[in-house]
Amino acid sequence: MAIVSQISRFITFTIISMGYSVLAVGVALTIHILSQLIVPKNPNEPPNVFSLIPVLGNAVQFGMNPVAFLQECQKKYGDVFTFTMVGKRVTVCLGADGNQFVFNSKQNLSSAAEAYNHMTKYVFGPDVVYDAPHAVFMEQKKFIKAGLNSDCFRQHVPMIVQETEEFFKKFNKPTGFIEAYETFGSLIIYTASRCLMGKEIRASLDGNVAKLYYDLDQGFKPINFIFPNLPLPSYRRRDVACKKMADLYSSIIQRRKDEKDNNNADLLQALMDATYKDGTHIPDHHIAGMMIAVLFGGQHTSATTSAWTILELANRPDIIKALREEQIEKLGSLKADLTFDNLKDLPLLEAAIRETLRLHPPIFQMMRRVVADKIVYEKNGMEIPKGNFICAAPGVTQVDPTYFNEPTTYNPYRWIEKTDPVHQLEQGDDANIDYGFGAVGISSKSPFLPFGAGRHRCIGEQFGYLQLKTVISTFIRTFDFDLDGKSVPKSDYTSMVVVPEHTAKVRYTWRE
């Protein structure tokens, strides 16, 4: 009887505890909802997007399809609004004015480092990029940009062609299927490593370096942005890989110094030869961190863009035909050698890549964190408080009918005919500002900013276009291809870059 009595009391206690828990959750939800509906809003701040769940906020809707979520919010709240994502308050600033506000914000008002360093420092290592003082980071960008010059690009094109042709030789004959993102992701690592990372890294790609890169890449996910340092195996592998990559670069640098091997047309050598303004040579761990950052920035953007370009072209045989005709007309034949100079003579090819970047920007949003007591959105006087993230969203603005005719249609010719409203806004007074690494080259008020703008504009844009032009040209020369009756796949938003769904396959046939 005593046992039965104890069991009965335990069951009763459990039921009561569960009841209190349910009641507590219900009360919390009710308070959260009523606080949004009843409590007066600050009229000087952007409107808040309604959410049902405290802390989590709008994270579920945003995570499922962030572009669609932001577009719906834009219809309801306008170009500027604030939503909550796992305790973080994000103020979104859409349109050309929103781009200008976010990308031109002064360092004492908002900070990219405060937005991203908690995640990137574990992947790139200490004292580089956002983990460095801002002035030092601008010097580091200048070093990297100096290593991405026309003389190097002329040497890079034949390297990329060779790597690409060797890679394609592994494809089955006469026909077969490739998974777009996986295939071009591998190819881009090979080409980028050959041109930028150094011959030693390229020679190691089929072994340990590829595994280290994969482990680092697993530390560059949305969960790492929300929770930068959890006691999980993937986080530990990330940290080990970062240390091993730094050690690897240090050993390569030391070998080059010992053997006086300094005649290398790669970025590694350019960084080894550079010095900071105070006259000190760049420390080995700085070089390693910058090289990792360059590889990540270039590989992610070029891998996704090359995959999306091939997928879009596979759905448009008329454009494939036109691209081949352009090469025959401008270069003489489809067998003519590709060079840094003659790639400039292919405007439709560049337009096809630009159109891909418009519809499928690898980074669909870019953020800063407010570090001043408040920051004022000049257009309407709204005040955004300290601690909020401010966010520009090229993935939304670049498909806005305000700026682009038939914005969801893949139409490379829009960049040649220049009839869209976007072409009236591309340049502004800030296009020639030099933040310490050369003129940025484009106004932050442009609605087309897949590479960002302002002091944090991507410095690898020229190399990216060069790499993409060479790879895409070689692919359309080598293969006929289509989507096997299917449509262009949907976007996968589960990583930090927007990739095609992993089921996206392209059917290819070797050309004579």
UniProtKB/Swiss-Prot annotation:
Keywords: Heme, Iron, Lipid biosynthesis, Lipid metabolism, Membrane, Metal-binding, Monooxygenase, Oxidoreductase, Steroid biosynthesis, Steroid metabolism, Sterol biosynthesis, Sterol metabolism
Binding site for heme: C458
Domain of life where this protein originates: Eukaryota
Location in the cell: Membrane
Enzyme Commission identifier(s): 1.14.14.154
Chief place of localization: membrane
Transmembrane segment boundaries: none
GO biological process: sterol biosynthetic process
PROSITE patterns xrefs: CYTOCHROME_P450
PANTHER family noted in UniProt: 24-HYDROXYCHOLESTEROL 7-ALPHA-HYDROXYLASE, CYTOCHROME P450 FAMILY 7
Role: Sterol 14alpha-demethylase that plays a critical role in the third module of ergosterol biosynthesis pathway, being ergosterol the major sterol component in fungal membranes that participates in a variety of functions. The third module or late pathway involves the ergosterol synthesis itself through consecutive reactions that mainly occur in the endoplasmic reticulum (ER) membrane. In filamentous fungi, during the initial step of this module, lanosterol (lanosta-8,24-dien-3beta-ol) can be metabolized to eburicol.
Stated name of the protein: Lanosterol 14-alpha demethylase
Species this protein is from: Cunninghamella elegans
GN (gene name): CYP51
